[in-house]
Each structure stands twice: as structure tokens, then as C-alpha cells.
Amino acid sequence: MRSPFAPLALAAALIAAAPAHAKPADPAVAKKILIDSVAIPTVEGRGKVPELAAYYAGVLKAAGFTDADIVITPIGETASFAATLKGTSAEKPILLLGHMDVVEADAKDWTRDPFVPVEEKGYIFGRGSEDNKFDVAMMVATMAQLKKDGFKPRRSIILLLSGDEETAMVTTRALAAQYKDAEFALNGDGGGGLIGEDGKAKYYGLQAGEKTYADFTLEVTNPGGHSSRPSAINAIVQLSTALAKIGAYHFAPQQNELTRVGMPIVADQVGGDIGAALKAFAANPADTAAIAAITADPEYVGQIGTTCVPTLVKGGHAENALPQRATANINCRIFPGVEIEAVRAELEKVIADPAVAVKTDPDATASDASPLRPDVMAAVTKAVHARFPGLPIIPSMSAGATDSLHFRAVGVPSYGVAGLFSKASDSFAHGLNERAPVAAIPGALAHWDSLLRDLSK
């Protein structure tokens, strides 16, 4: 198979030869946008997402965007946001993705009020300061700066912000359906760089795939009866047997372009026995020793195939009665490209008991990984290496879902290319005292400016 990086050197050379351009957005402006964004509590149920969308519209209109360039679409108590920087051609547009909503935060558990942004000791504290308002602020600031500069992209650039990515993704689905004819999408809610605790950059991760999140319900029903008269058929026992089979089962190892390209780079980073196993698996996905080593490591087991684990069990209705019903939830993270129904059928085969019904959660959506486009890889390489020369860039597949899931599902290649570089010890997304380093803002702005100018021309 031809390497996805075969045309990369040429593409990178062409990009590097591009003429100098105006400076990225002002870090002070971007910081204000971030702080103002965090101050609006866009948690599900508070109805504040439209307010944040209106704020972003105001920022962009002040830079020269017109009313016709911006569309805010209310959906229930939330909304979606779209802003278009028109291109000079009729070629397919480039999408920028992010989300305006945040997860809930209980003020009594935080050191500071999560919705009163505070700049302290080099950080901006507050819910959403990292996920996802940091890169959203950088994208909004960059779009505004491009407009001010009079930049004329060949391809239109459309900034799309969802309003319920953290929950139902209704706005995400609507945006994906509306903009399914795009060339590709760049998502600020995926990827990004890791800074070591010594302050040195370690690597940059480019997210090009997501495992499908799917829940399956196992259900056994019996007539029941008095516990003093036990029968050979017991719903809890039958369910327990099925769960034991699932717990002992391993889905067949799989490989895709992301693991073939990314695993050897990860292997060089981690070293040791697991590094050797990752490198061996990338070279030969049938290597049983490598499979055994990776399967035994919780950090990497999800990178080589589908995983399914029991997460909830319910059964019985009284202490002195035979159970009439027993259920369990099986949470699966499905390898990109594998159909949800195929996993359900495989679970049924593993259980091998027709008394155990296997039902699929209807909300699950499957999507394949995105191809590693040479133009995207070259642009990301240029942007990252401008900040950290020679830094490893690792194509990756995440276990959690972002808006990219629904865009990939409708055929839009999507790449997580966040501009944020941070230490692992600074990452508190969804957690207490979430924060973002102020020092990361200038580099993130340069990152987005470079990507958008290079990929849209």
C-alpha cells in the first residue's frame, strides 16, 4: 500500500514556499474572547448557548462580517452557529468545528466559581476554558483577523459551532446534514500538543478517527416464582453466564491507516516492552505476542480493536422471589469502520443463548476513520514545526466522541487539529478547576492562522 506521506514532502515544500502574510490575531483580543466565553454558562438547560452565539456574531461583525455571513439557528434551548468567510471559487468549502456548550460544574466543589473566569498564575480558570472554549476563541479570533486583513481564500471557510456536543448532539447532526458537501473539516475539539512536565514539547496528536460509542442491553425474562421453590431457569444466573462469556471474550485485532502510521511513532515515545509491542503490531497485526502485550495494557488495548465491557447490572424485584427480569448494559467502543449491527450479532454469537436478548441503543452512530490527506498533513506539519521544529506528529484515534463523528458519518473527512499545547498535569477538562495556560494563546493563534491560510488558498 502506498504510504500516506508519499506526496507529503512536495506538499510541504509548496506550502513553505508561500509568500509571507500578515500576523496572526492579537493574543490580547483572543484572551478577551476566551474570558468572555467562559463567563457565559452554556450548560445544558440554562438556555445560554444563543447568548454566546450572539457574542461571537458581534465579534465577527466588528471585523467586517455581514449579517448574511452569519447564521444562528435556535434548536430547543440551544443553538448552532455558522459564519462564512467567502472564497473566490466554487470549490467545496473547508469547515472549522467546535462546540459552545460545556458540561455542568458544581460551584461548591471548585476553588473558584466555575463560571466567573479568573486569570491567575498564568492560567485562565473556569468551566470550558479548555473544553472547548479555548480553541473556539482562537478560531473566532483568527476568522476575525483574516477578515480584517482582507484575506481572500480560494475555498470558503465556514466556522460551525454546535450547541449540544456534550449531550445529545442534535445541533451537530443538523450541521453535518446541512454541510455534508464540504471538502473536509478541521476540528478544534480534538488533537493538540503535549508538553512534558519539564516544559519541553513531547509530540502533537492529530485526531483522524473515533471509536463508535454504542450501548447494548442484555435482557433475560422468566416467569419467576417463590424463592423457596427454585427452578433450573433463573434470569440472574442466565445473565451472569452471558456476562462471564463477554468478559472473557476479545474481539479480533484490527489495524487501519492511523494505527499503521501512528503506532511506530508512539512506540518511539513510550519505549520499553509496550513500545516494542506497538511497533511489532504495526508491522504485523497477526503477531500474537504483540497482541497479548497490548491487550493487557489498559492504555493501548482500545487501539487495536473493538472492546465491550459490562457497566450496569439490574435484576430481581424482591429478596424472596425468583427474578422475573435481569438486565445488563454492555458498553462498546467499536473500531472505526465496523458496523454497530455486526457487533450486536457478534455478542449474540458469544453469548450463545437465545434466552438472552441483545438490544442496541438507537442513538449510536458509526463512522469510519478519515484518510490522512497529504495537504492536511503538510499544513499541520508546517504549523506545528513553526513552533516546535521536528516535533513528532502522531495520527490518532480517540475513544470518545466529538462533533467529527457525525461529519465523518455523512462523508466529510474530519481532523482534530487543536492549537492548544499543555501539560498533562494542566488538563482538567470536565473536571474540577478546569484551566488553560495563557502562554499557549500566541502559539495557538499562529497555528490556526497558518492552517487556514495554507489550506484555503
PLM features: residue spans?
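Bacterial N-terminal signal peptides
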Residues: 7-16
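Sec/Tat signal peptide C-region and signal peptidase I cleavage site
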Residues: 18-22
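N-terminal helical capping/dimerization or prosegment-like subdomains
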Residues: 23-107, 325, 329, 340-341
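Acidic/histidine-rich, surface-exposed loop or edge segments in extracytoplasmic proteins
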Residues: 31-42, 219-222, 354-366
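Second-shell loop/turn segments in exported
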Residues: 39-47, 124-130, 204, 224-230, ...
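An extended, acidic, His-containing surface patch that forms the Zn2+-binding/catalytic region
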Residues: 89-91, 194-196, 201, 254-317, ...
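Active-site metal-coordination/substrate-binding segment of hydrolases
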Residues: 91-161
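Histidine/acidic-residue-rich, glycine-tolerant segments that coordinate divalent metal ions
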Residues: 154-235
